[in-house]
Curated annotation (Swiss-Prot):
It comes from Halobacterium salinarum (strain ATCC 700922 / JCM 11081 / NRC-1). It holds the Pfam family Arginosuc_syn_C. This is Argininosuccinate synthase. Its main location: cytoplasm. It is found in: Cytoplasm. ATP binds at A9, F10, S11, G12, G13, L14, D15, T16, T17, G116. One of its GO terms (biological process) is argininosuccinate metabolic process.
Length: 396
C-alpha cells in the first residue's frame, strides 16, 4: 500500500472530512495535509475549515489565489465566455484551486493528491486534468469507494468526526469571487419553483434603476465610474452594485460532462455586467468578420474552460487570437441596471470602427462614395439565390 503524505483538497464539509481517516485506513497514507484555497469564499468557510482540520488533527494550509482567479475571470471576459448561456464560475475556479494544491503538495513533499468529489460531477475531472499532468498519485475516495451521503454520515458518527448531519443546509452552495451556485434538495426537480431565500447576492428585481461606467484596456476591465481598480476589488464592487438591482440570476438545466442534466441556480452580478459591457465595446471597435469569428472562438474557449482544461494547446491558440483582436477593445461603456438586466446604453472608444457621417440619413456623399453607388451591389445581392431558385423551379 502507499505511504507518505497526501495533500487533500479540504473544505471541512462532510465529504472531505470523512476522506481524512479513509486516506489512512483504506489507502495507507501516513499523513494527510488539508489544503483550502481562497478564490473568494466567505470568511466563515475558512474558519470552519480550520476548526475541522484542528479537530481532525491534520496540518492545514490556506492559500490565497484570489488574484490568480480574478485574472482568469478577466480572461473569460475577453473571450465573452459563457456555457449554455451563463457565465462560468465554478469551472474557472477549479483549475486555480488544483494548481494551488499541487504547489503545496510539491513544497511539502507529498506523494499524492486527493479530492472529495463524487463520480457524478464535473469537479473530479477538472481537478484531475491538472493533477494527472504531475508525477503524483491521485486519490478520489468518494468516487473510488462508492460512498453515499448516508454512509458518510454514519461513518462520521461512528468515529465521532467533527461533522453534524444536516449542518450543510438544504442546498449545496458553492461560492467564489465570480459566481455563487445553488443546487440540490428540491432544486433537483425541474418543476420546483425556488424560494427567494436561495439568493444571497442579488435582490429581487424592482423598478429601481441605475447606471455604471466600465472602462476597458485591451479587453480587460480596469475602472468603474472612472476610478481605477484592481481586479478583485472591481469584481467585488460590481457584485454589490449590480446585485442590488437584481442583475445576474440564472436558473437552468445544465448538461454536465458525463451526460447528466442537472438543475443549477447561479448568481453572477459582476460577471453579467462585465460581459455585457465588453460585448458592447467589441461591437464598436471590431469589424463584422472579427465579430463573427470571435463568436466561434468564444464557444471553444468556454467549452475548454468548462471542462477545466485551461492549459489545453487549443486555449493557447485561442488566447493568441484574443491577444491580437483585444488590442483594440479599449474604451468605456455605460450600463443601465433595470428590471434585473444590465443593458449597454452608451459606448465610446478611440478605436471605433464607426462613422456618424456614413451612417447618417442626412449625408449624401462619404469618402467619395454616393448613395447611388450602391445600385450595382444591390443588383448582385441575392443573385446566386435567384439562380438556384430558378433552376429548382425549372426542374419541377
Amino acid at each position: 500500500m502507499p505511504s507518505g503524505t497526501v495533500a487533500l483538497a479540504f473544505s471541512g464539509g462532510l465529504d472531505t472530512t470523512v476522506c481524512v481517516p479513509l486516506l489512512k485506513e483504506e489507502y495507507g497514507y501516513d499523513d494527510v495535509i488539508g489544503v483550502t484555497v481562497d478564490v473568494g469564499q466567505p470568511d466563515a468557510e475558512f474558519a470552519a475549515a480550520r476548526e475541522t482540520a484542528a479537530a481532525l488533527g491534520v496540518e492545514h494550509h490556506v492559500v490565497d489565489a484570489t488574484a490568480e482567479f480574478a485574472a482568469l475571470c478577466f480572461d473569460a471576459v475577453r473571450a465573452n465566455a459563457t456555457y449554455q448561456g451563463y457565465p462560468l464560475g465554478t469551472a474557472l475556479a477549479r483549475p486555480v484551486i488544483a494548481d494551488a494544491i499541487l504547489s503545496v503538495a510539491e513544497a511539502e513533499g507529498c506523494a499524492a493528491l486527493a479530492h472529495g468529489c463524487t463520480g457524478k460531477g464535473n469537479d473530479q475531472l477538472r481537478f484531475e486534468a491538472v493533477w494527472r499532468a504531475s508525477d503524483h498519485d491521485v486519490c478520489a475516495p468518494v468516487r473510488e469507494l462508492g460512498l453515499t451521503r448516508e454512509w458518510e454520515i454514519e461513518y462520521a458518527a461512528e468515529r465521532d468526526l467533527p461533522v453534524e448531519a444536516g449542518n450543510e443546509g438544504e442546498w449545496s452552495i458553492d461560492t467564489n469571487l465570480w459566481s455563487r451556485s445553488v443546487e440540490g434538495g428540491h432544486l433537483e426537480e425541474p418543476d420546483y419553483q425556488p424560494p427567494a431565500d436561495i439568493y444571497a447576492w442579488t435582490d429581487a428585481p424592482s423598478g429601481e434603476t441605475g447606471t455604471v461606467d466600465i472602462t476597458f484596456e485591451a479587453g480587460v476591465p480596469v475602472a468603474v465610474d472612472g476610478t481605477a481598480m484592481e481586479p478583485v476589488a472591481l469584481i467585488e464592487a460590481l457584485n454589490d452594485r449590480a446585485g442590488s438591482y437584481g442583475v445576474g440570476r440564472t436558473d437552468m438545466l445544465e448538461d454536465r460532462m458525463l451526460g447528466l442534466k442537472v438543475r443549477e441556480n447561479y448568481e453572477h452580478p459582476a460577471a453579467t455586467t462585465l460581459l455585457a459591457a465588453h460585448k458592447a465595446l467589441e461591437g464598436l471597435v471590431l469589424t463584422k468578420a472579427e465579430r463573427d469569428f470571435t463568436a466561434a472562438v468564444s464557444q471553444q474557449w468556454a467549452q475548454k474552460a468548462y471542462e477545466g482544461v485551461v492549459e489545453h494547446p487549443l486555449m493557447d491558440a485561442l488566447n493568441g487570437y484574443l491577444d491580437e483582436t483585444q488590442s483594440a477593445v479599449s474604451g468605456t461603456v455605460t450600463i443601465a441596471f433595470e428590471g434585473g438586466r444590465a443593458r449597454p446604453i452608451a459606448r465610446e472608444s478611440e478605436h471605433a470602427v464607426y462613422s456618424a457621417d456614413a451612417a447618417s440619413f442626412n449625408t449624401e456623399t462619404v469618402a467619395g462614395i454616393e448613395q447611388a453607388d450602391a445600385t450595382g451591389v444591390a443588383k448582385y445581392h441575392g443573385f446566386q439565390s435567384r439562380l438556384a431558385n430558378a433552376a429548382f423551379d425549372g426542374n419541377k
